[in-house]
């Protein structure tokens, strides 16, 4: 599916896989629905979904052709409020990274908005749909418990060196490596509020697996300049955008 991303390297193929909605993401761990709710921190487990408007079927909306054509997502049907999950990804071969996340989210998920900065990436959608999306993002190859962080605020650390256990720095210490079990536990929700019980995020991926799954070009992995096709396409886009900006005839 070359239209998703150019390149002939494994990194390029991994980017295409994430962005291709027909590609089945590899499931690497199991996280319960209740634990996903705890991680997000938007509502208590078992609490009803707060709403911002009545269910669509109860609203007297004017006739609209687009509304008839587009099937609303479940949360919109129910009137859920919009909520978010935000990730940060270590530059040390994390499986995903911000711009790839945004491209992939927009290709895979309806009714969601994605926002990207250099070291963080947020996705917003209706609350019950967000929980389904978050579960998939946490359980699959999008996420590694040591090199990926769920951080609603104070996200800094993606470019810092890893600690002695291979964990990415987090000033709020939301994800902790348990040396006794060899597994990572989330002890605070994404905003930094302490959880009553830690959530088991599973074992960190080993370095070989990370190198195989990463979407990050690095000189000590697969260097971007060595991916000739990707470089040629990006240079072409840059030149055409620059020329277009000058409004050349």
Swiss-Prot record:
Keywords: Cytoplasm, Methanogenesis, Transferase
Location, primary (coarse class): cytoplasm
Localization annotation: Cytoplasm
GO cellular component: cytoplasm
GO biological process: methanogenesis
EC number: 2.8.4.1
Domain of life where this protein originates: Archaea
Binding site for coenzyme M: 120
Reaction(s) this enzyme catalyzes, per UniProt: coenzyme B + methyl-coenzyme M = methane + coenzyme M-coenzyme B heterodisulfide
Disulfide bonds: none
Pathway: One-carbon metabolism; methyl-coenzyme M reduction; methane from methyl-coenzyme M: step 1/1
Activity regulation, per record: Methyl-coenzyme M reductase activity is inhibited by 3-nitrooxypropanol (3-NOP) in vitro and in vivo, by oxidation of its active site Ni(I), which stops both growth and methanogenesis. Is also inhibited by the reaction product CoM-S-S-CoB.
Entry GO MF terms: coenzyme-B sulfoethylthiotransferase activity
Alphabetized CDD domains for the sequence: MCR_gamma
Enzyme class per UniProt: transferase
Protein's UniProt keywords contain Transferase: yes
Family: Belongs to the methyl-coenzyme M reductase gamma subunit family.
Subunit and interaction comment: MCR is a hexamer of two alpha, two beta, and two gamma chains, forming a dimer of heterotrimers.
NCBIfam families per UniProt: met_CoM_red_gam
Function statement: Component of the methyl-coenzyme M reductase (MCR) I that catalyzes the reductive cleavage of methyl-coenzyme M (CoM-S-CH3 or 2-(methylthio)ethanesulfonate) using coenzyme B (CoB or 7-mercaptoheptanoylthreonine phosphate) as reductant which results in the production of methane and the mixed heterodisulfide of CoB and CoM (CoM-S-S-CoB). This is the final step in methanogenesis. Neither N-6-mercaptohexanoylthreonine phosphate (H-S-HxoTP) nor N-8-mercaptooctanoylthreonine phosphate (H-SOcoTP) nor any other thiol compound such as CoA or CoM can substitute for CoB as the electron donor.
UniProt protein name: Methyl-coenzyme M reductase I subunit gamma
Organism per entry: Methanothermobacter marburgensis (strain ATCC BAA-927 / DSM 2133 / JCM 14651 / NBRC 100331 / OCM 82 / Marburg) (Methanobacterium thermoautotrophicum)
Gene from which this protein is expressed: mcrG
